[in-house]
C-alpha cells in the first residue's frame, strides 16, 4: 500500500508522512514533535468539532444552505481529516503571528460584528458561501469546503428573538390586536416560526454538541485503551522478542553442539566403516581358514577312520596271534613232555659206562673194542653239542629262528647234566652243525651214567632208534614277522637268562649266580673256567628244569614290568630270581628316569648293561656324593664337577642309535655341556633334547657339535636356568646357530639375558616350521619386537610360552593377528621380572596395573580361550 493511500498524514511533515491509524500518528507526534504541538492539535480539534456542529444546526434552523448535515460531514473520514488538518495549521499560524490572510479576516470581522467568529477559521473570506451552497457540488466536495470558515449568526438570532419578544409585548395599532406569540404571554397564541426554529435549532445544537462531546470522550477513552493495549502488547512482544533471542542463542549453541556431534559421529562412522572393512577382510580370511580347517578335519576324520580300521585289524591279528601263541605253547609243552619221556626211555634202555670211559675213551677198566666203540660214538655226538647249544643261545633273539627248537634245548641244557661228570672236548671241524639231538641224548646218558655206574652196558639199538625218532620230530617255525616278538617272549627271557648277564661284569652277589647252569651251557670256555664256575653251583640247582608255569609267569611279569619306573624295577629285582630275571631284561629298560636321588658314575655304568634298548633317558635333579667334613666348598665343587659324565657316557654308548629322547635338567656342576657333546658322538638318532643348567649353559660351540652329530632333532630345550652363573653365554649367536643347524625344528625353548631381537628374528627366519616357542627370562617383548620377529617367520606357530618374560598387551595382539594357527598363549610373570625392588608399594601398584591390562585382553573376542596368565608373587 502506497503512502498517499493512507488516511492520516502528519500536519508538520506534510503529504509524504501518512499513517494508517490515529495511534500511529499520535506516536509519531510524540516521538518526532513537541508536546505543545500535540496539545494545540487536540484542543483545536475539539473546538472545531463543536463549532462545526453548532453552525450546522443554525443553518438548518434558519433554512440557510450553508453546508450539508453536520452528522454527514462528521461521518465522512476525509472531511473530518481535512477539518483537523486545516484547523491545526491555522491555529498554529494564529499562535505564531498574523498570517497573510489576517487583514481579510479582520475586515470580515468588522463587517459581521454580530457573528460569532471562532479563532480556528480555516477557509478564507474570498470564498463566498454561495459557492459552498451550489447545488452542483457533490456531498464530498461540500464536506471538503463547507467548513473552511464557519460563522454562526448568534447575534442575528438573538436580535430576532428580542424583536419578536418586543412585538408581542406592545399591541399593534390595528383594529384587532393579535395575540402575543411570545412564550411569556398567557394567551394561547402560538409562537412565531422564528422562535420555534430558534428553539429547535438551539436544542438540536445542544444535543449535537453533547453527542459530539460524548463521542470525543469515548474516542479518547478508546484511544487510551488502544494505546494501553498496544503498549502492553509491545511489552509482551519485547519480552517475547527477548525470549526468542535467548531461545535463538540457545538454538545456536545447540546447533554448534549438534555440529560438533555430527562431526564426531561422522568420524566415528568413518572409523566404524574402516573397522567393518577390516572385519569383512578378517571374516573372509576366517572363512578361508574355516574351509582349510574343514578340509583338514575331513582329512583327520579319514585318518581316524583308517586308524580305527587299522586298530581293529591289529586287534584281530593280535587275538589270532595270541591264539596261535597259546597253541604253540601247548604244543611246546607237549613236545617238552614227549622229549622228557623219550629221554627217560633212552636213559632207562641204554646202559651207562664209567665216566672215565666217556671222558677219555676207554682209559681204566676193560680196554677192548667193545668198550672203545661206544666211546668213539659218544665223542662223535658229544663234540658238536657245544656249538649247537651256543648257537641257540647266541642267536635266540633272532625272530626267524623257531622257538620250538630253542626253548627245549635251553631248558634241557640248563639242568639235564652235571658238568663235573663230563669233560666236553672241543668241537671238530668236520662235525655237522645239526647234531644237537644226538649231543643232548649223549649228555643225558652221561648224566645218568654218573649216578648209575653200577648198571651193565646194554645194546645201543634202542638208543639209536630213540635218536632217530627225535631227529624225525616235526618242526614248527613262526612265519609272520610281526608276530615274532609276541611268540618269542618265553625264548627271549630264557636266552637273556642264559647269555645276558655274562656279557657284562657282575657288580655283586645279588646279580650273580641265580642261573649258573645256564651260563655254563651258554659259553664255550676252557675246562678250567667251567670247573671254577661248576664249583659254585649246587647239585640241586644244576638239575633244575624251567617249567611251563615259570615261563608263563615270566611272560606275564614282562608285560607288567614294561610299565614300571626305574626305581621300582631296581626294587623288583630283589624279590626273587624270576623277578630279577625279568626286571633286568633290556626290553623293560626302554624308558630310564632318574630324578631326585644321589647317584654315582659306577651306578650309571651298571645300568648301561640293561639299557641297550633304551629310547628315552631322563636325568633330573641328581645330586653327587655328600661333602666331607674337612672338605671346603671349592674343593667339593672341583671334585664333583662332571663326576657323572663317565657313567653317562656308558649309558649313551650302550643305548646308541636306539636313544631318541635325552633330558638333562637341574644337575648343576655334575653334568656339564660336555654331555651334549657325548650325545652327538654316540646317539645320532636323537629327536628331542633338553639341557637346562644354571652353572654350565650351552654355548654356540656345543650347539654346533650337537647339530653336526644329531641332524634329526625336532624338539630342543636349551634355555638356561635362573639364576644363571653365566647369563650371557647363551646369546644371539647361539640362536643363529640353532636356526642354521635345525631348520626343521618344531619345538624350541630358549632364554637368557643374551637373547635379543636380532637372534630371535634370525631364528624365526630359518625355522619356518616352528610350532612351539618358549622364551624364558628374555628382555621385554614389545610390539616392535613382535613385529620384527613375526616379519621374518612364525607363521605356523601354535603355542607361545613366555616364562618370566615381560610382555605388553599390544605385542600379544600382534602375535595373535599374525600367527593365524595360534592356539595357546601362556604368560607366566612375576613382579621380580619387572622391578628390581618388588616389595615397594609403587612397584606393586604398577605391577597390578600391568596384570589388569593383560587380564583385560581375555575379554576380547578370540582371546578368552587361548590366553592363559599365571601371576607369581605380587597379585
UniProtKB/Swiss-Prot annotation:
Pfam families: F-box-like (PF12937), zf-C2H2_FBX41 (PF23165). One of its GO terms (cellular component) is synapse. Residues 170-182 have a biased composition (Pro residues). The modification Phosphoserine is found at residues 478, 762. Residues 209-351 form a coiled coil. The modification Phosphothreonine is found at residue 479. Residues 359-368 have a biased composition (Gly residues). Residues 183-194 have a biased composition (Low complexity). The keyword Aminoacyl-tRNA synthetase does not apply. The keyword Coiled coil applies. Transmembrane segments: none annotated. Residues 496-540 form the F-box domain. Residues 85-110, 165-194, 347-542 are annotated as: Disordered. Residues 347-356, 395-416 have a biased composition (Polar residues). The modification Omega-N-methylarginine is found at residue 360. This is F-box only protein 41. The lineage of its organism: Eukaryota, Metazoa, Chordata, Craniata, Vertebrata.
Amino acid at each position: 500500500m502506497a503512502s498517499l493511500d493512507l488516511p492520516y498524514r502528519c500536519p508538520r511533515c506534510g503529504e509524504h508522512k501518512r499513517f494508517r491509524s490515529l495511534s500511529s500518528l499520535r506516536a509519531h507526534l510524540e516521538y518526532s514533535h513537541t508536546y505543545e504541538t500535540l496539545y494545540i492539535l487536540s484542543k483545536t480539534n475539539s473546538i472545531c468539532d463543536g463549532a462545526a456542529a453548532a453552525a450546522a444546526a443554525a443553518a438548518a434552523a434558519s433554512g440557510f444552505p450553508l453546508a450539508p448535515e453536520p452528522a454527514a460531514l462528521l461521518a465522512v473520514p476525509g472531511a473530518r481529516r481535512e477539518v483537523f488538518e486545516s484547523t491545526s495549521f491555522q491555529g498554529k499560524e494564529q499562535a505564531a503571528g498574523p498570517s497573510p490572510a489576517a487583514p481579510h479576516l479582520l475586515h470580515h470581522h468588522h463587517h459581521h460584528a454580530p457573528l460569532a467568529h471562532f479563532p480556528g477559521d480555516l477557509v478564507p473570506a474570498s470564498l463566498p458561501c454561495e459557492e459552498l451552497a451550489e447545488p452542483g457540488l457533490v456531498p464530498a466536495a461540500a464536506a471538503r469546503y463547507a467548513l473552511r470558515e464557519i460563522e454562526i449568526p448568534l447575534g442575528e438570532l438573538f436580535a430576532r428573538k428580542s424583536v419578536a419578544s418586543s412585538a408581542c409585548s406592545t399591541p399593534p395599532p390595528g383594529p384587532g390586536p393579535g395575540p402575543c406569540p411570545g412564550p411569556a404571554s398567557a394567551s394561547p397564541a402560538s409562537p412565531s416560526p422564528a422562535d420555534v426554529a430558534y428553539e429547535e435549532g438551539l436544542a438540536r445544537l445542544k444535543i449535537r454538541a453533547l453527542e459530539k462531546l460524548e463521542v470525543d470522550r469515548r474516542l479518547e477513552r478508546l484511544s487510551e485503551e488502544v494505546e494501553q493495549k498496544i503498549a502492553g502488547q509491545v511489552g509482551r512482544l519485547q519480552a517475547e522478542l527477548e525470549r526468542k533471542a535467548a531461545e535463538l542463542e540457545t538454538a545456536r549453541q545447540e546447533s554448534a553442539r549438534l555440529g560438533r556431534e555430527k562431526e564426531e559421529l561422522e568420524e566415528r562412522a568413518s572409523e566404524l566403516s574402516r573397522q567393518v572393512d577390516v572385519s569383512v577382510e578378517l571374516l573372509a580370511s576366517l572363512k578361508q581358514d574355516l574351509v582349510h580347517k574343514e578340509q583338514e578335519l575331513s582329512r583327520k576324520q579319514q585318518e581316524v577312520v583308517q586308524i580305527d580300521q587299522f586298530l581293529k585289524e591289529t586287534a584281530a591279528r593280535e587275538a589270532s596271534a595270541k591264539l596261535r601263541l597259546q597253541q604253540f605253547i601247548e604244543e611246546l609243552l607237549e613236545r617238552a613232555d614227549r622229549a622228557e619221556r623219550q629221554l627217560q626211555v633212552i636213559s632207562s634202555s641204554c646202559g651207562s659206562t664209567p665216566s672215565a670211559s666217556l671222558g677219555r675213551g676207554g682209559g681204566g677198566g676193560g680196554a677192548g673194542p667193545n668198550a672203545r666203540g661206544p666211546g668213539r660214538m659218544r665223542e662223535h655226538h658229544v663234540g658238536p653239542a657245544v656249538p649247537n647249544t651256543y648257537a641257540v643261545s647266541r642267536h635266540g633273539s633272532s625272530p626267524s629262528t623257531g622257538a620250538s627248537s630253542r626253548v627245549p634245548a635251553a631248558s634241557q641244557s640248563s639242568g639235564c647234566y652235571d658238568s663235573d661228570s663230563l669233560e666236553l672236548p672241543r668241537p671238530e671241524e668236520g662235525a655237522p652243525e645239526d647234531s644237537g639231538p644226538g649231543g643232548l641224548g649223549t649228555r643225558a646218558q652221561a648224566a645218568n651214567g654218573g649216578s648209575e655206574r653200577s648198571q651193565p652196558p646194554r645194546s645201543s639199538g634202542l638208543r639209536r632208534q630213540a635218536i632217530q625218532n627225535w631227529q624225525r620230530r616235526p618242526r614248527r617255525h613262526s612265519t609272520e614277522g610281526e608276530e615274532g616278538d609276541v611268540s618269542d617272549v618265553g625264548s627271549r627271557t630264557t636266552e637273556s637268562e642264559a647269555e645276558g648277564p655274562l656279557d657284562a661284569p657282575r657288580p655283586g652277589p645279588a646279580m650273580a649266580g641265580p642261573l649258573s647252569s645256564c651260563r655254563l651251557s651258554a659259553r664255550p670256555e676252557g675246562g678250567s673256567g667251567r670247573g671254577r664256575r661248576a664249583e659254585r653251583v649246587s647239585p640241586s640247582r644244576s638239575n633244575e628244569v624251567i617249567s611251563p608255569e615259570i615261563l608263563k609267569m615270566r611272560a606275564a611279569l614282562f608285560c607288567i614290568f614294561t610299565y614300571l619306573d626305574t626305581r621300582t624295577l631296581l626294587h623288583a629285582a630283589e624279590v626273587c630270581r624270576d623277578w630279577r630275571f625279568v626286571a633286568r631284561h633290556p626290553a623293560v629298560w626302554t624308558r630310564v628316569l632318574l630324578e631326585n636321588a644321589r647317584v654315582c658314575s659306577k651306578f650309571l655304568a651298571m645300568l648301561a648293561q640293561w639299557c641297550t634298548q633304551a629310547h628315552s633317558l631322563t636325568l633330573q635333579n641328581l645330586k653327587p656324593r655328600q661333602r666331607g667334613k674337612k672338605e671346603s666348598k671349592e674343593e667339593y665343587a672341583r671334585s664333583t664337577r662332571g663326576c657323572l659324565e663317565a657313567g653317562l657316557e656308558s649309558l649313551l654308548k650302550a643305548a646308541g642309535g636306539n636313544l631318541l629322547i635325552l633330558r638333562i635338567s637341574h644337575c648343576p656342576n655334575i653334568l656339564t655341556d660336555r654331555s651334549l657333546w657325548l650325545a652327538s658322538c654316540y646317539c645320532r638318532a636323537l629327536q628331542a633334547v633338553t639341557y637346562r643348567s644354571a652353572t654350565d649353559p650351552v654355548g654356540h660351540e656345543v650347539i654346533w657339535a650337537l647339530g653336526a652329530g644329531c641332524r634329526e632333532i625336532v624338539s630342543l630345550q636349551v634355555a638356561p636356568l635362573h639364576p644363571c652363573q653365566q647369563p650371557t653365554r647363551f646369546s644371539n649367536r647361539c640362536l643363529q646357530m640353532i636356526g642354521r643347524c635345525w631348520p626343521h625344528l618344531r619345538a624350541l625353548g630358549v632364554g637368557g639375558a643374551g637373547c635379543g631381537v636380532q637372534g630371535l628374528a634370525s631364528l624365526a627366519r630359518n625355522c619356518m616350521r616352528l610350532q612351539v616357542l618358549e622364551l624364558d627370562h628374555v628382555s621385554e617383548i614389545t610390539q616392535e619386537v613382535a613385529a620384527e620377529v613375526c616379519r621374518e617367520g612364525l607363521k605356523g606357530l601354535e603355542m607361545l610360552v613366555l616364562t618370566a618374560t615381560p610382555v605388553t598387551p599390544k605385542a600379544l595382539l600382534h602375535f595373535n593377528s599374525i600367527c593365524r594357527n595360534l592356539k595357546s598363549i601362556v604368560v607366566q610373570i612375576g613382579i621380580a621380572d619387572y622391578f628390581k625392588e618388588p616389595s615397594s608399594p609403587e612397584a606393586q601398584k604398577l605391577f597390578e596395573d600391568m596384570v589388569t591390562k593383560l587380564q583385560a585382553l581375555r575379554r576380547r573376542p578370540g582371546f578368552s580361550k587361548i590366553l592363559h596368565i599365571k601371576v607369581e608373587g605380587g597379585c
